[in-house]
Structures are given as C-alpha cells and as structure tokens.
Amino acid sequence: MRKPNQSTERLNGLPKSRQLLNGEPGFEPGKANQLLTVSPPPRSGSSDPYCLVKVDDEVVARTATVWRSLGPFWGEEYTVHLPLDFQQLAFYVLDEDTVGHDDIIGKISLSREAITADPRGIDSWINLSRVDPDAEVQGEICLSVQMLEDGRGRCLRCHVLQARDLAPRDISGTSDPFARVFWGSQSLETSTIKKTRFPHWDEVLELREMPGAPSPLRVELWDWDMVGKNDFLGMVEFSPKTLQQKPPNGWFRLLPFPRAEEDSGRNLGALRVKVRLIEDRVLPSQCYQPLVELLMESVLGPAEEDTASPLALLEELTLGDCRQDLATKLVKLFLGRGLAGPFLDYLTRREVARTMDPNTLFRSNSLASKSMEQFMKLVGMPYLHEVLKPMISRVFEEKKYMELDPCKMDLGRTRRISFKGAPSEEQMRETSLGLLTGYLGPIMDAIVGSVGRCPPAMRLAFKQLHRRVKERFPKPEHQQDVKYLAISGFLFLRFFAPAILTPKLFDLRDQHADPQTSRSLLLLAKAVQSIGNLGQQLGQGKELWMAPLHPFLLQSVSRVRDFLDRLVDVDGDEAGVPARALFPPSAIVREGYLLKRKEEPAGLAMRFAFKKRYVWLSGETLSFSKSPEWQTRHSIPVSHIRAVERVDEGAFQLPHVMQVVTQDGAGALHTTYLQCKNVNELNQWLSALRKASAPNPDKLAACHPGAFRSARWTCCLQAERSAAGCSRTHSAVTLGDWSDPLDPDAEAQTVYRQLLLGRDQLRLKLLEDSNMDTALEADTGACPEVLARQRAAAARLLEVLADLDRAHEEFQQQEREKVALGPLGP
C-alpha cells in the first residue's frame, strides 16, 4: 500500500487509513477455481463476454474476451490500491462486437459497506442486474447554500458553481448539462452548457419558502437533448435539518434516483466474485520501531534462542490461511532492513530442525516455505522474465497442438486442418514428442545457463539453504539428492513450473492462454516439475503416458545438478551489499511501444502528431526512442512527474490515451500524451508510472482530462491554458504487482494485526496460567530456561502491542473529535 500525499494522509501527526482491495481467485499450481462466470440465457445462441472492473468511476481492469461462450471462465486476479474516499466496486459484463458498440449484458455493484460487512470478504454468485441509465451516474457538484430571512420571510439562496466528471451521454463523449433546483413546490434551472462534462455555471438561484412543513433541497443535473427526453446525470438532496444547522458548502457526490426495488436480473445470468477489502490505519514509523526491533533481534540472536524468540511466537500464532500474506510482509520488512538473508536463514534453520524425513522437507505451506516463495517472486521476477519470457511468447504465438495422453488426443484435428487422413495415435505421439522437446530444450538451456543472471540475494539464500540441509542430514545416503531437492523444490516447483503453467499470474503475458495453449503449457510445466524433482517419481504408476519424455527428463536432471552446484557457489563479497530493495532504481519495470505526442505541436495535423516510440520506465527515468536498438534517447526524470491521468477519448478522438504532467526547474508544467493499444495496457502503464512517481512532492490535486486545442480546453471549455485543472487526479489508484515498492510502515502494521489475532492465545498459553508449565514442558521437551525465555518474549510482545493499541486509540480519538465529515475536497 502506497502512502498518499502527506497533506491528505496525516492528521495532527497521525496518518489516515489506507486501503487495499484484493480480488483473489484461489489459484493453486495445476488448478484454478472458477472466479468469474456469467451465464446469460441463450438468446442468439452464443456471446463473446468480457468483464470490466471499475473502482468508483475509474476502469481499473478488463478481462480477456471469451469467444462464443455462454458460461465463460476468466480466472482473473487483481490487487488494487485504493484512494481514501473509495466508495464502490462494480463489475460490468459486456458482449464484444467487432462492428459497432459492445452490448452491456449486466452488472453488479458492491458498496464499500457491503464488502466490509464480513471480514472474510465476499465469495459467492451474484445475479447480474440491468444497467439503468438513470442509475449510471458519476461525478460531483459544487454548491454553496445560504438560508436568509427578510421582511417577506425565509429565502434559500443556492449558488451553483460547477460540476466535474459527469457521465457522458452524447455520442461525442460529452454532455450538455444543466442544473434544476427543487425546494418545496418551487423549482429553478441554470443555463445549459454545451459539450462538456465539466460545466462552470457560477449562477445564484433564489427560492422563497412556501407555507407548510419544511422541505428538503434537491439539486438534479440533466443532459439537455434537442430531440427526445433529457438524460438524467445525478442528484444530491439535503434534509431541512441540514439546511438549518449546516448549509451545504463544497463538493458533493452525485447519486442516482432511489429505486423502489432492485432488479434481480435473474434472466441475465450471474457472476461469481471473490473480493476482500483490507483497510488499515498506518501509523508513523516511530510507532512501529519497538515491534520491528523485536523481530530483528529474533533473526540476529543466537541460534539456541530460536524457539523462544518473538518471531517464533508469531509463527506459532499464524494460521495457514494467513501465512502467505504475513510471509510477503515479513520478507518486504526484512528486505528494507537489508536482512532478508538472515531472516530466511532463521526460518530455514527452524524448519530443517523439526523435519525428520528429508523427503518431506519444505513440502508443507509453512512460514518458511511461503517466505522463500514470496522472496523469489519479489526479488527474482526480472530474472524469471529474462529466462522464460522468450519461450513462453513463442508457445503463445505458434499455437502448436501437442498431446501425449491418449485419452485426450484429438486425432481428427490434423485432418480438419490439412484435409489429409487422420494420423494414428503413434504418429500423433511422435509429433507431439518432437514439439515438446523442441520447446523444453531451449527452456532448459535458458535455465541452466542463467547462473550469472540470477539475483545475488537469491543465490545467497539458496547457499544458506544448501548448508542447513547438509548440516541436518549429513549421512551419505542423504547427500546424493537432498541437498539438491531443497533448492530445486523452490526454484523449479514453486517458481519456474508455476510461471510456465500460468504466465499471466507472473506478468509473462497480458492474458490467460486459450484451452489449446493452456494444455501445451501444462505439459511443459509437468516436464519441468519432473526435472525439478530430479526424476525421482518417473515411472511410478502415475501418468505413464509421459514415458516418451523420460529420456529427455533424465538427461536434463544431470544438467540441473550441475546448475545448482554453480548457483550456490557464491560468497558475500561477490554478492555485494545486502539487498534493501526489490530491484535497483535503474531497473526497467515496464517497456514497450507506445504512441507519443507532445502538447499542441504548432502547425502539425492532429492525426500525424502521435508518433510511434519505444518507451522504458525505471525508478529514475521515463525514456523514449524510435526503436529498442536506437542509441539516441529522450528521457524525463521520474522525479519531475506531477500527475499521471487518463485523457478523454474526445480530446483527440482516440481511445486509450494517458497524460504525463511534468514540472521543469522553473516551475512550468509540461504534458506528454501517450496512447496504448488497449485498456489493459493503459491501466498497466498508469499504475507503473503512478507507483514510480509516488514519492514525488507537490503532486497535482487536479488536472485537465482534455487537451488545449483551438484556444480552449476540450474538457471544461476554459480559454486559459494555465487554468486550474477541472478533474481530480487518481494517484492512489494502482494495480498491485511484483514491482510494488517497499512500504515498511504498512508491512509492520500487518504484523501487528496478525499478533492481535493471537493475543488472547498468547496470554493464555504463556503468561496467565502458571499451571501450564509442566504440560508445556512435557509437550515440547523444553527445559524451564526455554519456557522462561518464551514467557519473557511473550511479555515484550504484549507490551509492544499495548503501546500500538494506545497509538491507534489516539488516532481514533482524533477522528471522533473531528468536525462531522464535510463535503468532498477539491
């Protein structure tokens, strides 16, 4: 979770809450649980559905289109970092049309309250509802209301200033908005402003109070249409009590008309989603310092105190379903301190010490296994991309049919393609075997030849693991394979093989594979997994149809042993200083071809203004050149970026355009426009640029989603190029992935939250019941000295938790003492 700007995050020295939205498909290697499925009735016989995911009014993701299906499976997973004022999550299911506009099948909307009602989140089928234009509202309106009295009675003065980010109702992507104010039986209207979603009225409407009971104030926004009825854009309403005690003054979110009953949409199908919202109050760094120091002491302390350390107690209190999240946060926390190696060595030492059978080493989902797995994903993702991406891309592009299992062979496939006779089962097997080895050969060549490219931190972690296993199992019968299996079990079974099986989850591809390619990837992943197991399970009764591959697999095993020997042949001096980040600032986090345009090039026709450029983004620069091989590059320092936002389609009559607003040394703002191929690429670039520029000061709170053309802004129609931005920026909305920066405070907060869950158990088990000493000693074999150290560690943990409790209570007290929540900010 990234920190928002200090000006919005901190309140009297304490920060506001941060939020993280997780969409989790429950994926396991070799198995995907159905996450999103829509089942519309067979109207035309088939559909080409895809799903849009929106946070409030911002599209954050688009799934792949599943062609010719009434029951598609997407299996998409998204982690979204949210702004503080997040209100709603929506899923729109659409039918893609190659000609004309895509048809909306239906949608589901989940309010923030609905998601947080159950701490476990939502995991269920939800019926799609019809998309009602009167309910599809967005944006905000700025009002200032006064209640006045004179000799003729009471008067309501409503100053309608402006609105922003209204829903587009016209085919041009804009609207013709006007406001209508109701008070009692009276109503007045503002003027209509044509072709804008960001109207500025600055009009004052006065209404006299009529006899009778006090009336609420309602302000409606409408899109004026010359032909047909006007389109509803949204409304706000204020009770008589609010008008009397605290007249509205500021920005207010537009709401739809209340509906008598919700459309169940039973005939539209249903969507299955799994959503979890994590909202944490993240305190200043000094509040977490005692907790962090306790965890560091656990890692740096003597080995004989492993079982009595605070980190050991944390491991005991963590349930299986929480271990992955905790492992990720702990790895990041220790990475930021340069202690990832000692942390992994500590967990490895404990795991190896309690393992009796070397064949079961690291096979469970223990904290040690999960931490090493997350460490590889965090530190080794660029390495994984370098090794596997070329061959994965080749498999996707060539779309070869491969099958060894006779029960799954489609012998008529070749005949349908080539109009020749169907091949025999043996011919199909030989052809598939040649294709599989043709892919596996380069994959294994890339892996065994990648020693020099493997991150030094990973090599040191594997060396420590290698040493601990040799010390625990020194007998000759163990030495042959155990020292290799411990490493290959992580590197091959938990890293390479899962990445081959599901490339999208490892950012190797933008979309999931089609069924045929997915089967090819499964066969390749099975082969790599067998090699990672050093061929120990070959020919043991399972999947005997893989036997034709056995000679290749056994030949590769000897190469893997040599590769692992070279991989762990590294020392601290060669590895350099301990890693304190996921990757160096100069590392490329995203690259690819985009269309680039500078702001308003004079005398150049607009359709020629966008030029194809190859773009690199690192933590330091955003660079452009004509091609990847081109030596001349133009670069923008990431530290100069002040906003990264979408651009309305109507600005250039082009879709998927974003803007990067930078500030030079003289304080002048400059805008670079970039066009992406599709909405997913747009979201990925937006997210990457926002995360890279997150630490920058002086971020813009608002900018223009249009372009300055023909002496005015296309969005708000203002004539001054220097006019203040008309739309709020969305710097807090980013997609979570492997390139997320370290955030020590948020990671420490997660550890604190996990300890809170086990605090009562900790008190009962190690502090409050002195009669448990004898039973605990009998169960664990621990001596009284160990029990005393455990009790002391628990006491220190509970003391730290109490201090953090008081800090959080102080924050909550400040929240309670705040004036009632006011209108939306600028």
Model-predicted segments: where are they?
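Eukaryotic beta-sheet cores, primarily in C2 and C2-like/PH beta-sandwich modules
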Residues: 1, 51, 58, 75-112, ...
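The phosphoinositide-binding surface of pleckstrin homology
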Residues: 1, 33-43, 61-70, 124-130, ...
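Acidic, S/T/P/G-rich intrinsically disordered/coiled linkers that flank
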Residues: 1-73, 79-178, 182, 579-581
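Long, low-complexity intrinsically disordered regulatory regions
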Residues: 1-36, 42, 117-120, 124-151, ...
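Extended alpha-helical scaffold/tether regions of large eukaryotic proteins
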Residues: 2-3, 130-132, 214, 235-611, ...
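Polybasic phosphoinositide-binding surfaces of eukaryotic membrane-targeting domains
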Residues: 40-42, 49-51, 78-80, 173, ...
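Conserved tryptophan-centered aromatic signature that marks the ligand-binding surface of SH3
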Residues: 48-52, 59-60, 66, 70, ...
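Pleckstrin homology
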Residues: 53, 111-123, 133-135, 181, ...
